[in-house]
Amino acid sequence: MGGGGPGRAARRGPTCLWVTLALAWGAGSRAAAGDGDGDGEPGPGDAGTPCGAEGWARAAVPPGPAFVAAASYRGPGNNDTRSNKALPILLWWSGSLFPHFPGDTERIDCPRGSCLVTRSRRAARHRRTKALIFYGTDFRAYEAPLPRLPHQTWALFHEESPMNNYLLSHPPGIRLFNYTATFRRESDYPLTLQWLPGAGYLRGPALPLAEKDAWRRRGYGPVLYMQSHCDVPSDRDRYVRELMKYIQVDSYGKCLHNRELPSERLRDTSTATTEDPEFMAFIARYKFHLALENAICNDYMTEKLWRPMHLGAVPVYRGSPAVRDWMPNNLSIILIDDFDSPQELAKYLDFLDKNGEEYMKYLEYKNLDGIKNQFLLESLERREWGVNDMTLPNYLNGFECFICDRENARVRAEQEHKKSRGKTPAPSPHIAHFQHMGCPMPTPGFGSVEDLPGEDSWKEMWLQDYWQSLDQGEALTAMIRHNESHQGRFWDYMHEIFLKRTRQH
């Protein structure tokens, strides 16, 4: 990856972008130059001060008893006999995700060892705080905790859309982290099937074809579109708008709205985003559901894909290029990108609409033993977390135990290295790589970038966001490399990158 690429030229001009940036840069520089609110760089301190911090940092560290009084539960198979005051600490930097209630600190007993977990940022510079856990949607390069301490790892939890933070789709951004839990199967703790409760969800009964045909005779279209989140990186509305020229598409959401839901209750968006029985029964009458994700990335698959399959509708899908790997059999979805144009897709949908026998082939996975994909079945069986399953941990608790076990292993390896006086090698750092997220540059939903007018809002928003995220990843990486302690200097680094880009172009 780099500063080039077809989308790079589509960024806003220097005046528009950097007027905004300069304001923030100036404000950040002034904050860095002043006394600040805890932005001073820690000094050498003394042996009794966590991480050698002094002054503001010493006051920010909780007293020892705060990490001794945490609740304790001895899980089966865990023989860790250490007291709380000897355990590694994991800090949920994104405190809203802290998966323990009530309180701010908890002891967790995982398969291979125990840790304390906390959401109190006062623990950030404690010598026993071994890992910081960040939520990808909330992570901002200009707010990252600096300086980055050498004894701490950074962990990323990001189950949501790539559009929430394109910083993570560039090598400088994703390589900031040591452990990852993302929708990609290549991540350390994959969450790929987070929207699929189990194989039984796919086997749910479909509405009889006769009822769907009766629905058609009442004037309803064969194709459903239900979206209220418009202007997204996948640019799905642009494609659907073109498709509508060739086949009837009933659109009930705010995007391309052309039909009203039959009741005020169903028109409530909160109902339309849940598996409400009335809502589900209504949309199950449609033969085809347009299932276009808001962003394109390998293994990013949401309820837009799985819900139609649960109901017995056929998804007309665009999203993960690798979606076939996860399908129950070889004929269960229709891929938009298999067709040369929306017109060709419309012809095929019309053919299936008029030929029930051919249409029903797409629902054969619902038959007894109809799920033929062993990779899918084994992946569901192998995952250690559950979806709406009280017998299994949720993926937040699972990921923190994943980190806990690896941090305990790292601590033991470091102790062994120190005890052997170098004869035993020090543990090598585990670094996330591009495939842990690695989502491509957004492209238009229909046509090419070159075909779009200069003032196209999608082009101005998403191409700029994608490439600015690369710059932000490079800026934060440089700050960490230079052991910066002032967040406000982020905009100085961004300015340097901007000047470098300007010289290159």
Curated annotation (Swiss-Prot):
One of its GO terms (cellular component) is Golgi membrane. It is a single-pass type II membrane protein. SUPFAM superfamilies: UDP-Glycosyltransferase/glycogen phosphorylase. GO terms for molecular function: alpha-(1->3)-fucosyltransferase activity; peptide-O-fucosyltransferase activity. Pathway: Protein modification; protein glycosylation. Protein O-fucosyltransferase that specifically catalyzes O-fucosylation of serine or threonine residues in EMI domains of target proteins. Attaches fucose through an O-glycosidic linkage. O-fucosylation of EMI domain-containing proteins may be required for facilitating protein folding and secretion. Belongs to the glycosyltransferase 10 family. This is GDP-fucose protein O-fucosyltransferase 4. It comes from Gallus gallus.
